[in-house]
């Protein structure tokens, strides 16, 4: 199984070599506007029935996200929910004298639990195992912790500013990164983490090598199939000791599958998509667990796994819909196409903290924030878009953002 980063690299190489499949997903980190401008996809609206288009839940097909100038280019894979909840091993909890029915709720309780598990494990297991080679996963986690502390840093890959500035040097972001610094200092992070992709970390967690794992609902069906006796549970991401000042951020359904511009039989490709998103197939994959459909009415009827239902309910209660500039201000698409990535990025900074190569966490974030601000401003200038298009004064991070305003 390919990790997200590996899939992105494989797809991008195939597309640039002219070997793209007839149907392919939008590579991670690539905006739809960029893909369309480079001739990767062809519009599919003419090949889809209105009944099919209307079957998607509200917010699934948005201008600037799945659609450009009224033409649908890609479809979302699933409804987007929080994918950074915390799984924990109930058996390890009991072995370490922790109550599996009362998991940690605050940052200090979480760090303390990780330390207790690590000390009790004595090399057999550790407090937490991370997908350390997947910078994207680490950035998603860090943004989640920071947003809960009030950073208003939005979801992975989304540009947001507060008073015209990015939030990456905020006190909330710095305190979130300090969690990883403390876990590393305590020796609570599994030592193999820095080299692990998400599937490997997931597998080792199920083998009893750590007390905690931060990932998404996709873990559940894998463990049901491969580790049927694994005694796991799920909890919300812990909040700061003085209480949450935001929710775990997520945006609306994201772009996924489109028809290649080189596809010679787009009608057949569209027919495949019609079946893929049909109620029968969507109901089956929802009932299998680990999947939340973007087709209206399917989730309520088909979700049957109790752990998946618990994950879904926690995601809905702790997660808060954040503003997506692409959906709210479509002109921002040109900014995204112009912006240059700053390295090390947030995920790579977390990697450095885990590995011990970054000890000045505040300084690392200050530098990243300054470099990012310059890159964002340059992209805005090149696109002729004011940076205020990425600022949402009406955004209360403790509530779902109201897209109807």
What spans do the regions from the language model cover?
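Hinge/lid segment of periplasmic solute-binding proteins
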Residues: 29-85, 140-143, 148, 233-235, ...
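Long, aromatic- and glycine/proline-rich binding clefts that accommodate carbohydrate-like moieties
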Residues: 228, 235, 287-355, 385-405
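Short, solvent-exposed loop/beta-turn-alpha elements that line the ligand-binding surface or hinge
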Residues: 45-59, 103-105, 149-175, 225-227, ...
């Amino acid at each position: 199984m390919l990790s997200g980063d590996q899939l992105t690299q494989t797809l991008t190489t195939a597309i640039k070599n002219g070997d793209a499949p007839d149907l392919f997903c939008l590579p991670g980190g690539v905006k739809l506007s960029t893909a369309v401008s480079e001739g990767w996809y062809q519009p599919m609206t003419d090949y889809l029935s209105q009944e099919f288009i209307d079957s998607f839940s509200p917010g699934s097909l948005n201008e600037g996200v799945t659609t450009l100038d009224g033409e649908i280019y890609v479809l979302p894979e699933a409804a987007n929910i929080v994918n950074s909840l915390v799984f924990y091993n109930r058996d390890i909890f009991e072995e370490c004298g922790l109550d599996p029915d009362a998991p940690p709720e605050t940052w200090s309780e979480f760090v303390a639990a990780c330390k207790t598990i690590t000390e009790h494990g004595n090399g057999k297991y550790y407090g937490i195992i991370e997908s350390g080679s997947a910078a994207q996963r680490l950035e998603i986690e860090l943004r989640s912790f920071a947003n809960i502390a009030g950073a208003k840093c939005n979801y992975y890959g989304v540009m947001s500013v507060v008073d015209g500035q990015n939030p990456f040097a905020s006190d909330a972001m710095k305190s979130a990164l300090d969690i990883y610094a403390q876990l590393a200092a305590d020796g609570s992070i599994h030592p193999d983490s820095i080299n692990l992709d998400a599937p490997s970390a997931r597998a080792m967690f199920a083998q009893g090598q750590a007390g905690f794992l931060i990932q998404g609902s996709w873990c559940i069906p894998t463990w049901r199939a491969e580790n049927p006796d694994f005694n796991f549970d799920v909890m919300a991401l812990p909040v700061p000791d003085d209480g949450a000042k935001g929710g775990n951020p997520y945006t609306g359904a994201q772009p996924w599958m489109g028809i290649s511009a080189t596809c010679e039989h787009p009608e057949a490709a569209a027919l495949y998509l019609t079946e893929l998103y049909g109620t029968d197939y969507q109901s089956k994959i929802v009932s299998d667990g680990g999947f939340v459909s973007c087709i209206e009415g399917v989730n309520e009827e088909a979700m049957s796994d109790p752990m998946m239902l618990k994950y879904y309910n926690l995601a809905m209660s702790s997660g808060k819909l954040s503003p997506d500039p692409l959906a709210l201000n479509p002109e921002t698409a040109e900014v995204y196409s112009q912006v240059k990535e700053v390295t090390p990025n947030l995920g790579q900074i977390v990697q450095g903290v885990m590995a011990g190569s970054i000890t000045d966490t505040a300084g690392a974030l200050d530098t990243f924030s300054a470099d990012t601000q310059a890159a964002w401003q340059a992209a805005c200038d090149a696109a002729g878009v004011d940076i205020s298009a990425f600022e949402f004064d009406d955004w209360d991070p403790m509530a779902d953002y109201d897209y109807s305003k």
